[in-house]
UniProtKB/Swiss-Prot annotation:
Protein name as annotated: Large ribosomal subunit protein bL17
Similarity field: Belongs to the bacterial ribosomal protein bL17 family.
Disulfide bond entries: none
HAMAP family per the UniProt record, alphabetical: Ribosomal_bL17
PROSITE patterns reported in the protein's UniProt record: RIBOSOMAL_L17
Signal peptide start-end: none
GO molecular function: structural constituent of ribosome
Any GO BP: translation
Quaternary state and interactors: Part of the 50S ribosomal subunit. Contacts protein L32.
Cellular component, GO, one term: cytosolic large ribosomal subunit
Amino acid sequence: MAYRKLGRDSAHRKAMLREMTTQLIMNERIVTTETRAKEVRKTAEKMITLGKRGDLASRRKAAAFVRNEVADIHEEKDAVVVKSALQKLFSDVAPRYKDRNGGYTRIMKLAVPRKGDAAPMVILELV
């Protein structure tokens, strides 16, 4: 499978992709460089597809990739409900795309490049 090195060794690259995919699931929108967004898009699409399947094996595969971070905290009837990124993926994000076959993300280019190195910046968001 072809992939971009992104100027990092394999462990750093995998950690960065895991973190950015988790942030995309939690916030549903991230601002990053164009090449990073194209790589994160691949992993995010795979995680949402696993979420659509919803079986135990898919949950375990997604849990092995998505970081265990708190996505949402709110109160319901005298109880505090804490939802993790994995729970949000399977209960909120994946059901939204049950009738869609792929293409769960959108990349929109920003007009202004990054100030330090003029890298092209984009917004990666869930459709």
